[in-house]
């Protein structure tokens, strides 16, 4: 189980939003590259970046901060990035500049043909991000609900060739209210590709609960507010996850 620290970028700073509200942001660092370095020292093996301005504007907005992070981590740590990715040129630019995986969210739901083309052009580098509440997919920075069932849509995108699905329970993200294990497992069981859980992780208990269902197809978990506010120690949590995965690991 990979624990993946989230670095959410707004106006060049590392912030956290509560339930996706841009005007409810807490600034945790004015130096995102230093934050990336910190999480790697704590044992992170992958980083999750979100261009929040880009997600709302529909085009990249934090290029300087993103490049500073990829320069900092080099080729050693895979970096996945989402937010404002709406065309193939943007994907190519990011992949050419140190990003390992590009996350397509709203654009995949609104324009499935774009996701299909992206998977064909950049095989192995496209992750789809599905944000859902009560099993239904949300788009546009969570501001609009759709009628799409998250499992049905994920299965369709799996057939396109996406590398993984990031599943965010938007009723829980940034609220430290615990992971929606049932919904995450339901999705993972329906797919052949890995699922990365997101939203609601508050403590080591949540990590242990995810590790217990890891074999259902859950490869990792994105954590944000918990590691920034100190309710979860990233290093201890990754060590615990590794121990549970080891042969004979205690439950």
Swiss-Prot record:
Matching entries from SUPFAM superfamilies are given as: Ribulose-phoshate binding barrel
Gene3D superfamilies linked to this entry: Aldolase class I (3.20.20.70)
Give the Pfam families listed for this entry.
Answer: His_biosynth
Return the GO cellular component terms, semicolon-separated: cytoplasm
EC class, as a word, reads: isomerase
Q: Which residues form a coiled coil?
A: none
**What is this enzyme's EC?**
5.3.1.16
Q: Which family does it belong to?
A: Belongs to the HisA/HisF family.
Write the protein's name. 1-(5-phosphoribosyl)-5-[(5-phosphoribosylamino)methylideneamino] imidazole-4-carboxamide isomerase
Q: State the organism of origin.
A: Azoarcus sp. (strain BH72)
Give the gene that encodes this protein: hisA
């Amino acid at each position: 189980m990979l624990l993946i620290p989230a670095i959410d970028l707004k106006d060049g700073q590392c912030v956290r939003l509560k339930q996706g509200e841009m005007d409810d942001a807490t600034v945790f660092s004015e130096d995102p590259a230093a934050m990336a370095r910190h999480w790697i020292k704590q044992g992170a093996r992958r980083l999750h970046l979100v261009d929040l301005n880009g997600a709302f504007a529909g085009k990249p907005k934090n290029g300087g901060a993103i490049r500073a992070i990829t320069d900092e981590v080099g080729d050693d740590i895979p970096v996945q990035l989402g937010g404002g990715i709406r065309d193939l040129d943007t994907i190519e630019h990011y992949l050419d500049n140190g990003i390992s995986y590009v996350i397509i969210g709203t654009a995949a739901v609104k324009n499935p043909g774009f996701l299909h083309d992206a998977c064909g052009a950049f095989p192995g580098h496209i992750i789809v991000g599905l944000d859902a509440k009560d099993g239904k997919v949300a788009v546009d920075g969570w501001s609009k609900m759709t009628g799409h069932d998250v499992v049905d849509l994920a299965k369709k995108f799996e057939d396109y060739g996406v590398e993984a699905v990031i599943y965010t329970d938007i009723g829980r993200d940034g609220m430290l209210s615990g992971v929606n294990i049932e919904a995450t497992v339901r999705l993972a069981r329906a797919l052949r590709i890995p699922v990365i859980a997101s939203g609601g992780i508050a403590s080591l208990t949540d990590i242990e609960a995810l590790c217990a269902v890891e074999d259902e197809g859950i490869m990792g978990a994105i954590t944000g507010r918990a590691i920034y506010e100190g309710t979860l120690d990233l290093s201890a949590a990754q060590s615990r996850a590794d121990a549970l995965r080891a042969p004979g690991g205690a439950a």
